[in-house]
Amino acid sequence: MSKIFRYECRRLLLSKFFFGLAAVTCFYGWQVLEHVTILGIAHTASFSPWSFGDYLSRLLPLLWLGTLFSVSVYTNGAERRAAMLTQAAPMHPAVYRLARFLCVLTASALLSLAAVFTAVCFYARMFRWHDWGTLVLPALVTLAPALLFAAGGGWLIGYMRVWLLVPWALFPFLSAALPLPEALGLWNGKLFSTRPLLLPSLDPAFSLSPETIVMQCALALAGAGLFFWAALKK
C-alpha cells in the first residue's frame, strides 16, 4: 500500500493545478490578513487564536474547493474506467481506494499548511510575534473536521455522479451566509467574533463550548463514515 500511496501522491501533488491552488491560497490568505485580520476580532489582538481562527474560517471555502479538486482526480470518468484494471490486480481494490483517499487528505493538509504558513509569516513580519503553539488548536478544530467531511462526502457523491461535486463545492459558501447556531459557528466564523465577548477576561484563551466540540467530532466521524460507505458500495 505504501508504494501505491507514494505513486498517487506524486501524481496528485506534482500537478500544475495543485501548485496553482497553493499559490492562490497563499495570495488570498495574505489579502485577508492584510485587510481583515490585522484589525483584530472581537477586541482581541490580530495574532490571537480568535483572530487566527476567523482567518482560517474565511479561507475554508477555498480549502474545501481544493479538497474537492483532489477528489475529482480520482472520481472522473477516466479514473473510473482505469479502476477496472485495478480490480483485476492481485491487491484488493479497497487498498487502492484507501491509498487514494489518504492522498486526498494529504493534499488537503498541505493546502491547509500553506494557509497557516502564510499567517505565520505575516505575524512574524508585522508584529515580530512567534508564539505559534497557540495557533495549533484553532487550526485543528477549524479545518480538520470540515475538510475530512468535504473529502468523505465528495468521495461518495463523486463516485455516484462526478458533476455532483459542483453543488457540494457550494456548501461552505452557503454555510457562511446562513445564521447558524453557536454549535456550527466555526462554519461562518461567527464563533470567533462573538464568543470572546462572552468570556470574563479581556484577552481570553481559546476555548469552545461542549456543543461545538461535539459537532466538530460528529463532522469528522461523518466524513470518515461517508468514505467507508462509498468504499463498501464499490
Question: Can you annotate each of these PLM segments?
Answer:
Residues 82, 104, 108-117, 212-226:
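N-terminal hydrophobic signal/anchor transmembrane helix of membrane proteins
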Residues 5, 9, 13, 93-105:
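Interfacial transmembrane-helix starts/ends
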Residues 34-50, 168-234:
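Terminal transmembrane helical anchor/hairpin motif
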Residues 23, 27-73, 98-168:
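Secretory targeting signals
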Residues 1-24:
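Aromatic- and glycine-rich beta-strand/loop motifs that create alpha-glucan
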Residues 65-83, 154-162, 218-234:
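Transmembrane alpha-helical segments in integral membrane proteins
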Residues 85-94:
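Short helix-to-coil transition segments within interhelical loops
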